[in-house]
Amino acid sequence: MIPGELMPADGEIELNAGRATVSVTVANTGDRPIQVGSHFHFYETNAALAFEREAARGFRLNIAAGTAVRFEPGQTRTVELVALAGDRIVYGFNGKIMGAL
């Protein structure tokens, strides 16, 4: 073994297997780009992002950890969200939940 060497298992790795997902169409109504990270509670994103917020409650972007999606001003795109796991207790972000989902 070499320090830092990666030894992935054979085959494909499926992210968030078996978890509930939902797709939402998002429009950036602002005049600046907005970037949303992989583990940000999507319901609590920047108010300039227009989408069905209630559909996103308890969900985050279904992308690899440590990555993000950027929404340019005036851009509309559909993204897939995945249900938050664990105890499903949310604190911080924009302070809209501050407890159990």
Swiss-Prot record:
UniProt keyword terms in alphabetical order: Cytoplasm, Hydrolase
Pathway, per record: Nitrogen metabolism; urea degradation; CO(2) and NH(3) from urea (urease route): step 1/1
Any one GO cellular component localisation term in the record: urease complex
MF terms (GO), sorted A to Z: urease activity
EC id: 3.5.1.5
Reactions mediated catalytically: urea + 2 H2O + H(+) = hydrogencarbonate + 2 NH4(+)
Transmembrane portions of the chain: none
Subcellular localization: Cytoplasm
GO biological process, one term: urea catabolic process
Family: Belongs to the urease beta subunit family.
Quaternary structure (record): Heterotrimer of UreA (gamma), UreB (beta) and UreC (alpha) subunits. Three heterotrimers associate to form the active enzyme.
Name the UniProt record assigns to this protein: Urease subunit beta
Natural source organism: Cupriavidus taiwanensis (strain DSM 17343 / BCRC 17206 / CCUG 44338 / CIP 107171 / LMG 19424 / R1) (Ralstonia taiwanensis (strain LMG 19424))
